[in-house]
């Protein structure tokens, strides 16, 4: 266990808009013929790349002010084949969901690509079910990776049992069915994020819920323009929740955060560890639950993270693991093999960086465990506390970078993180906001 070493200014903060909802607001605005509006849009590289891709297909975009955009779409029958590749940068959500949508647009042909990191991420998980729907989609990279070549066509009715709980697979197939005006019946073994379903309902559509993890949609679909309000991203708030509960003094009130039941696993996991976090001012906006979160300095302990929580905390596991460094008894995460398919292999990345800190970590195919109190780690921590520098490798991963910036702040250790520019993919202004929270 590492000692806490930071005091906070008690006050209110806001974090950027939800990344998942920002991507989806562009996709539904594109599907809806006519005008739509979004407020609270995350102006970070990933969703902006999705927006840029659809402008090349015929979507008109006007920025009203920071975070607020107006869209005018020709509708799904009015899109054109772009004369350039659609570059999604590092946006795995953007490329997978857009691939599904474009597969269902007859006559629209496109190549979807991204940066070096994105080209390593698995695409077979969407290619296989889309192909079974009748789609024409090829992974041009090794092992069915991006670039993706799509030739839009009319798709057939489809029933799919997903082998993994994945909101990206589910949303990809939903958007393919919606674009192609066809039926989809979908089931999964654990409930994944349901932002796409909520936005779909918000537009006036019905979903037949066969069981908690099994649903069906069928045309005709209602695709009229609307106003989408994007709340703050709980995955971004998670960094400041951990900062708040591990501070020696001070409270943070993080305002206007999306509290979708499939996303609040981070709150449940932190509470299982002993964190005190209060939910205030709960309300509904555009089909999504929203509220404010207040943190209190807490004493954390090792706990068992239930398998059922893993899909809802998959993006927050790096920062949750950092919290584990300050917990009595250490930390263990299992059933999280999906971490290996993120922006980096997050299991290996976290393990290697923890080992650089001198922590004895047991790596598993689906996670890792550490107690944090070995003689070797205690010697290294004394070494770090004396001001000696140690290097942390980000592996081009924004969440790894931000997690270790929080660790550096809490511990006071002189860490050097090789590159912090990756933060721009999801949280512009992160370091400035972090600095503003500290009571010097």
Swiss-Prot record:
Its EC number is 2.5.1.19. GO terms for cellular component: cytoplasm. Keywords: Amino-acid biosynthesis, Aromatic amino acid biosynthesis, Cytoplasm, Transferase. It catalyses: 3-phosphoshikimate + phosphoenolpyruvate = 5-O-(1-carboxyvinyl)-3-phosphoshikimate + phosphate. GO terms for molecular function: 3-phosphoshikimate 1-carboxyvinyltransferase activity. Pfam families: EPSP_synthase (PF00275). InterPro entries: Enolpyruvate_Tfrase_dom (IPR001986), Enolpyruvate_Tfrase_sf (IPR036968), EPSP_synthase (IPR006264), EPSP_synthase_CS (IPR023193), RNA3'P_cycl/enolpyr_Trfase_a/b (IPR013792). Its main location: cytoplasm. It is an enzyme of class 2 (transferase). The keyword Zinc does not apply. Monomer. HAMAP family: EPSP_synth. This is 3-phosphoshikimate 1-carboxyvinyltransferase. It comes from Leptospira borgpetersenii serovar Hardjo-bovis (strain JB197).
